[in-house]
Amino acid sequence: MKILQQDDFGYWLLTQGSNLYLVNNELPFGIAKDIDLEGLQAMQIGEWKNYPLWLVAEQESDEREYVSLSNLLSLPEDEFHILSRGVEINHFLKTHKFCGKCGHKTQQTQDELAVQCIHCGYQTYPVICPSIIVAVRRGHEILLANHKRHYSPNGGIYTTLAGFVEVGETFEQAVQREVFEETGISIKNLRYFGSQPWAFPNSQMVGFLADYESGEITLQESEIHDAQWFSYDQPLPELPPTGTIARKLIHVTLELCKAEHKCD
């Protein structure tokens, strides 16, 4: 981090937790003085549109109006990823002010994104928690679940199955375990789909497509309120927001369901 001078220039990432300050739904741009940033701490984390991109240290008291990152999923993908990166780096710096090995204070390294203990020299890098997310298809049907965190009296969001990768697991093993734990369904024909950074606060969602193999839906009641098979040609429940990897998985799977039905 450096102390900003009045003529420091570029795009500015200001965060409060997973919230960001935007101007007309865009990152503020200009010199530090004009955006009332002079004297604050910041670090350059890259470039955006060929200009420096600065992450400003989070302020305890700030009268600016912030917007949740989760409300910005409709932004272009590259812009959403820039915002996510800022949120994740901010979270890392806030939660690693002290050494996890000896408890002394840390300081940022000069040549890479990391913090180092000023006492024992132990170096820590941003923590990324890998999670899997999978869409399961059975013929012309897709398996969707209403997680307890998404439940509402009107039904709530139905989405794909997901969960964190456990220590010692492959991504493929995690997918098979999560699907079976949450719904009692066994799957086959597992294939990679894509990934999405998920800064809530520091996950990396790794997406898969899979086909039904066997089993009847048996809910993991501590996690899942409801799970059902939905046909592509029937009304669907409320789905995750556009821009999420969950919504992309659902869209692709519904297209596969439609193609399967045409071949019958």
UniProtKB/Swiss-Prot annotation:
mRNA decapping enzyme that specifically removes the nicotinamide adenine dinucleotide (NAD) cap from a subset of mRNAs by hydrolyzing the diphosphate linkage to produce nicotinamide mononucleotide (NMN) and 5' monophosphate mRNA. The NAD-cap is present at the 5'-end of some mRNAs and stabilizes RNA against 5'-processing. Has preference for mRNAs with a 5'-end purine. Catalyzes the hydrolysis of a broad range of dinucleotide pyrophosphates. This is NAD-capped RNA hydrolase NudC. Its cofactor is Mg(2+); Mn(2+); Zn(2+). Homodimer. It is an enzyme of class 3 (hydrolase). Divalent metal cations. Mg(2+) or Mn(2+). Binds 1 zinc ion per subunit. GO terms for molecular function: magnesium ion binding; manganese ion binding; NAD+ diphosphatase activity; NADH pyrophosphatase activity; RNA NAD-cap (NMN-forming) hydrolase activity; zinc ion binding. It comes from the Bacteria. It catalyses: a 5'-end NAD(+)-phospho-ribonucleoside in mRNA + H2O = a 5'-end phospho-adenosine-phospho-ribonucleoside in mRNA + beta-nicotinamide D-ribonucleotide + 2 H(+); NAD(+) + H2O = beta-nicotinamide D-ribonucleotide + AMP + 2 H(+); NADH + H2O = reduced beta-nicotinamide D-ribonucleotide + AMP + 2 H(+). A motif (Nudix box) lies at residues 163-184. The keyword Zinc applies. NCBIfam families: PRK00241.1. The lineage of its organism: Bacteria, Pseudomonadati, Pseudomonadota, Gammaproteobacteria, Pasteurellales. It comes from Haemophilus influenzae (strain ATCC 51907 / DSM 11121 / KW20 / Rd). InterPro entries: NAD-cap_RNA_hydrolase_NudC, NudC-like_C, NUDIX_hydrolase-like_dom_sf, NUDIX_hydrolase_CS, NUDIX_hydrolase_dom, RNA_Hydrolase_NudC, Znr_NADH_PPase. A divalent metal cation 1 binds at residues 162, 182, 223. A divalent metal cation 3 binds at residues 178, 182, 223. Substrate binds at residues 112, 125, 196-203, 246. Residues 126-253 form the Nudix hydrolase domain.
